[in-house]
Amino acid sequence: MKTLSAKPAEVTHDWYVVDADGKTLGRLATQIATRLRGKHKPSFTPHVDTGDFIVVINADKITVTGKKAQDKKYYRHSGYPGGIKETNFSKLLAHKPEDVLHKAVKGMLPKGPLGYAMIKKLKLYAGTEHPHEAQQPKALDI
């Protein structure tokens, strides 16, 4: 018996919706990264994008434990000398709530063309509304 190797044309991508209300950042991000990569499927193949589409609602209500709301730092650079900017979790959550979960999940995915294709299947929304009702996403309890 041979090992199954998934072909890109044969892979089906399902749609799931996840409610992030009250969920812990890291625990939710690991589950989402696993689903985006496709490691939960028996037909997982490392060099093929076998993952599903994930729609996350209520991204503005995600939590962290301890004092990480003030202590967790996020950095970005403008490209100019001395252009490094720093913000903490609570400020980033107030300003751009989708970026918190996006950065956490992106760091858990492989780097390169396949990883970039996987992160595009993650759809993040701060509120309860999302424009993906036509895809009939299934509720995923994490």
From Swiss-Prot:
Example of a GO MF term: structural constituent of ribosome
GO BP, sorted A to Z: negative regulation of translation; translation
Top-level division of the source organism's lineage: Bacteria
Keyword Ribonucleoprotein attached: yes
Keyword check for Translocase: no
Signal peptide: none
Keywords: Ribonucleoprotein, Ribosomal protein
Gene3D superfamilies: Ribosomal protein L13
SUPFAM superfamilies associated with the record: Ribosomal protein L13 (SSF52161)
GO CC annotations, alphabetized: cytosolic large ribosomal subunit
Function of the molecule: This protein is one of the early assembly proteins of the 50S ribosomal subunit, although it is not seen to bind rRNA by itself. It is important during the early stages of 50S assembly.
Database matches in PANTHER family: LARGE RIBOSOMAL SUBUNIT PROTEIN UL13M, RIBOSOMAL PROTEIN L13
Record text on subunit structure and interactions: Part of the 50S ribosomal subunit.
Protein family (similarity comment): Belongs to the universal ribosomal protein uL13 family.
Name this protein carries in UniProt: Large ribosomal subunit protein uL13
Organism for this UniProt entry: Psychrobacter cryohalolentis (strain ATCC BAA-1226 / DSM 17306 / VKM B-2378 / K5)
Lineage, top ranks: Bacteria, Pseudomonadati, Pseudomonadota, Gammaproteobacteria, Moraxellales
Record gene name: rplM
